[in-house]
Every structure is written in structure tokens, then in C-alpha cells.
Amino acid sequence: MNVKKLADLDVAGKRVFIRADLNVPQDEAGNIVEDTRIRASLPSIRYCLERSATVMVTSHLGRPTEGECRAEDTLAPIAVRLGELLGKPVRLIRDWVEGGFEVRAGEVVLLENCRCNKGEKKDNEELAKKMAALCDIYVNDAFGTAHRAEATTHGIARFAPVACAGMLMGAEIDALTKATENPARPLVAIVGGAKVSTKLTILKTLAEKVDQLIVGGGIANTFLLASGKRIGESLAEPELVKEAQAIMDMMKARGAEVPLPVDVVVADEVSALARANRIPVDEVGPHDRILDVGPKSSAKLAEIIAHAGTIVWNGPVGVFEHNQFAGGTKMMASAIAHSEAFCIAGGGDTLAAIAKFHIAQDIGYISTGGGAFLEFLEGKKLPAIAALEARFAD
């Protein structure tokens, strides 16, 4: 993928408009409870400030009604936190689309919630042109919204004098390209989660590329059904058994594999107090719920991971939130941490597992995108990246 990158541009004295993803969780009082996304935006902002650029940053926050900016929609708490992290005050500019505000060289301002502007979500061309007129260089650093064609992620990139990827966006593109376009083999994908239906496209796409497709959670239960196993009262989608079988057949025809559990951890309920039993997969009873893979299966998965050249990880293999059902995900996480392979991981549950088992420093790249990460792996064109590609030659 060819896109211009911020690090390759001379931004000195230029007006730089950065679309970041500062959509952080807040409590009922509006206090920020987790600031990873704000921290992830700092390298691009600092790069521009250190070179005496005039820096404008905007982001969405939540799902405001266009044309309104209620108290819960404001980026004011973000401006305070950003200022603390940068060690300098960050002014919040409201009603900024028409311009009329001053920003000094070496100063950064935060432009109020971009989704409060009428036309943002529909990628309105007139709005995009007005925003493009505010800057000399447009920087997209919001990979988490790259799958959405909106005025600040797509339209502005068409009309700004220069359009480029920020530090974070560039790193995401590089890591995903490394994992998917010319990966070191064997290529192993781990896809966990509750439902095949939400991951069907990605499973089909990966089945055409990977050497091993490890499935976990409710997804694995549907594959077990397809292979003729009894799963008791486990979460599954019987109506998608044919699709699961087709994916296994596709893998087999390529000489690849979907390694299914030979033993499982079951209980009669999903709770912190549930009693866990380890049993062979052929002994699952009519009222059992499969909530994790067993130790033999975990060891097999760990061996597959140990021999991988590239690992793409999206989702746990068990209900790891409860310790008695965390063994499979824990062993898999440990295997990834000790692997020589390049690993890219993404998705909320995956990030929670990485945090729980303290392996963040051992993962090659942790993606900040949820839906964008999945759509990239599905092989879809992400509108925001496509817009940057279209401006590469300018």
C-alpha cells in the first residue's frame, strides 16, 4: 500500500490538521477511565509541534446527534488530558468548520467533536472542502475509523493540499501488510468469539491464505458440530454448520488445517463459581457447556504457534474472564509470547487477554482498530486508506 507518511514530510510552519481517534471511555461524571487512544495519538502531535507547525487535532467521541453538541459529547475532558500528557495547555475550539480562529506556530488546539458537524457521517463534500481549507497538510491517524467514509476520514483527504498517514496509521498499515501480503510461513490465524456469523467473512478469507486456522469460543463449537461432535448446551450456531464444513473442506483441499479440540473444559453454567470439568471431547454430556479447550488441545495449539512464522490473533479460545476457563487462552498467550513469529493482535477481547496475561511487550504489533482491523483482514478496501492511496502521487 502506497501512502504518504507524516515522517517523510516537511511540516515546519505549516497548518496541520490531524484526525485522531480520541474516543476514550468515560464514567458517568465524564472522567476518562482509560487513555490508551490519547497516548497513541501523541507521536504525530509531538512530531508536528517539535517542528513548529500549527497543529489542529479533532476526533469523534461517542454518537452525538449531528448539529448538536451536548455536555456528554464535548472533547473538553480530552483537551485537559491531552494537555497533561503534552505538558502544555490545549485549547478547545468550538464551531470551527468556518475557521476564524487563531493558532500559533508550535501550538496545538483541539477542534470540538467532529461528529457534531452536520454532514460528517455522510461524508458531505461541501463540509469536507471547508475543513480542507483550514490546513496545508491533512494527517489521518485514526485507524480505528478507517473503515468508515466520513468527512474527516475520507472527504477531507480528497481536497486537502497534501494528505498523509500519521505515525499510528502508518504503523498499522505496515504491520497489517507484513502479516497479510507477504507473510513469513507458516501463517497461523487465531479467530475466537461467540458467533461464526459475525466472523464468517474473515474465516472464509483467511481459509484461502493461512496454513493453520485456530478457532475458539462459540465459533469452535459450531465447527465441532460440523465435524459430528456432540456439544450439549454449548453456545453454537447450528444453522451455520454447512458454512463451517465448507471452511474446513477449503482448508483441507489446500493441505491446511482447522485443528479442533480433542479435550474440553465444561460446566453447567457460565459463572465465577461454576465447577469446571476437563473431559475428552467425545464425552460431552447433554447438559454440558464447553467453556474452554482442555490441556491436550492447549498443548497442541501451543506447538502450532511455536512453529509459526506469522500469527494473526483475533479472539480468545475460552471464557478467560473466569480463571477456571482461562487455561487455553493463557497457554496460547504464553506460546505467542515465546514465539519467534511476528504476531499482530486486535479486537477488544484479545486486548483484554493480552492485558490479563501481561504479554503486551511480547506482541509484534497490537492494533488499535476493532472493526477496521477485521475488515482489513477480510480483504476489504478501507475508505480512509483508499483516500490516502489516491493522493500518493500528488
UniProtKB/Swiss-Prot annotation:
Superkingdom of the organism of origin: Bacteria
Annotated Gene3D superfamilies: Phosphoglycerate kinase, N-terminal domain
A single cellular component GO annotation: cytosol
Enzyme class name: transferase
SUPFAM superfamilies for the chain: Phosphoglycerate kinase
Major place of residence: cytoplasm
GO terms (BP aspect): gluconeogenesis; glycolytic process
Disulfide pairings: none
Entry keywords, A to Z: ATP-binding, Cytoplasm, Glycolysis, Kinase, Nucleotide-binding, Transferase
Localization terms from the record: Cytoplasm
Catalytic reaction list: (2R)-3-phosphoglycerate + ATP = (2R)-3-phospho-glyceroyl phosphate + ADP
InterPro entries: Phosphoglycerate_kinase, Phosphoglycerate_kinase_CS, Phosphoglycerate_kinase_N, Phosphoglycerate_kinase_sf
ATP-binding in keyword set: yes
One example GO MF annotation: ATP binding
Binding site for ATP: 199, 321, 347-350
Enzyme Commission designation: 2.7.2.3
Pathway where this protein functions: Carbohydrate degradation; glycolysis; pyruvate from D-glyceraldehyde 3-phosphate: step 2/5
Quaternary structure (record): Monomer.
Family to which the UniProt record says this protein belongs: Belongs to the phosphoglycerate kinase family.
Name of the protein described by the UniProt record: Phosphoglycerate kinase
